[in-house]
Every structure is written in C-alpha cells, then in structure tokens.
Curated annotation (Swiss-Prot):
This is UPF0231 protein KPK_4613. Belongs to the UPF0231 family. InterPro entries: UPF0231. It comes from the Bacteria. It comes from Klebsiella pneumoniae (strain 342). Disulfide bonds: none annotated. Pfam families: UPF0231.
Length: 120
C-alpha cells in the first residue's frame, strides 16, 4: 500500500493512496482533515479490539471506517445496500468507494500522517 502526503497552496494536507486503497485517502481528506482526535479514537479502538472477536466502526459524513483485530475497511456511505440488491454471481466494487487493508498497515499510515502534519 503506497501513499503520498501533499500540501495544497492553502497548506491543507491531502493524502493520495495507491490503487485499491483510494477510499483510505478520501477518508483522511474528508473525515480526518486536521482532526487528530479522530485518529486517537481509531488508534484506541484498534488496541481495544486487537486479539478479540470484537469490531468497531465510526461513521463519518462521507465515509465509514470499520475495523476488527486484523482488518480495516473504509467505505463510502453512499454504498449502503443489502446483499439482495446484488445479482447472483455479481459483486459490487468501486475502488474509490471501498478499501480494505490490514490494521498494522493502516496504523503505519496514521503514524506517517501525524508526522507529516507536524512538519508545518
């Protein structure tokens, strides 16, 4: 999972992610922005569910983050649909609306994001 942090001309940090992980970048850009307390909440949740059967989720304005002890899923809220809406044999996937990655990989991106934010 490759990523890049940039600042636009106004100083706002933007995250770009590799293919198949675009929704993670969108989550940072739309939900986190400068809200490092949200990252604290996610990191705490990751510690809480680690090694258990539990999961945790945080719905935002545009994206929802879901995690368990092994995996993080970020999906666009517009992807609300039930399994019955998908034809048999078909799967719905929009790479900019849904991303999955391991918890450890995700936490590495969070740490790198924090570090980049401190380089103002």
């Amino acid at each position: 999972m490759d990523y890049e942090f940039l600042r636009d001309i106004t100083g706002v940090v933007k995250v770009r992610m590799s293919m198949d992980h675009e929704a993670i970048g969108h989550w940072f850009n739309e939900e986190v922005k400068d809200n490092l307390a949200l990252l604290d909440e996610v990191e705490q949740a990751a510690r809480t569910v680690k090694g258990s059967e539990r999961s945790w989720q945080r719905a935002g304005h545009e994206y929802t983050l879901w995690l368990d002890g092994e995996e993080v899923m970020i999906r666009a809220n517009q992807l609300e649909f039930s399994g019955d809406e998908i034809e048999e044999g078909m799967s719905y996937y929009d790479e900019e609306s849904l991303s999955l990655c391991g918890v450890e990989d995700f936490l590495q991106v969070v740490a790198a994001y924090r570090e980049f934010m401190q380089q103002r």
